[in-house]
C-alpha cells in the first residue's frame, strides 16, 4: 500500500510486527507516516485499528485501496510437491482457502505477517515451507514464486488509511479522491433496549 500511495516518491518503509506497535512507533516519532489497514472485503472492518486510531492523536491524511493478490513462494529449487507447510497471516490463509483445500499436504501455519513469513523462510532457509504473501515480498526476499493468484476471491480489496501526527499532517498533499471524505467517531451510552 505504501509503494502504491507514494508511487514515484523515494520512501523508506519501517516494518512493524503488529498494529499496536505501529501506533506506538508513530506516537514516538512525529515525522513518520503510518499506513493502517482499516477494512477488507472478506474480513470486514478491522475494529482493533478503529480503536487504535480513536485513542491516538493521529490525523487521517489519505487512503489507498489495494486489490489483494497472493502468491505461493518458497526457496529456490523447491517444488510444490516438496512443501509441507504454508506460512502466512491467518486472514491470508483464509483468503486462500480453496487453493489450500486443493493442496491438503500443506499444513497451514499462522504467522504474524504475510511478508514476515517470506522473510522468515528466506532468512532461516526453511525447506518444505512456503509463504503465502504478495508478489513483491516474495521477490524482495529472493523466493521462487510457485503459483500466482491463489486467493479465492479475485475481487478482494483492503482499504488502508494514511495517518500522521498533526504536526506534519498539513504538509502532506491530499489526493484528489480523499478531499470529500470525513471520518466521525461517536459513542452512545451502553444501556438496555
Where do the model's predicted regions map?
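Domain-level signature for soluble enzymes in the chorismate/prephenate branch of the shikimate pathway
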Residues: 1-193
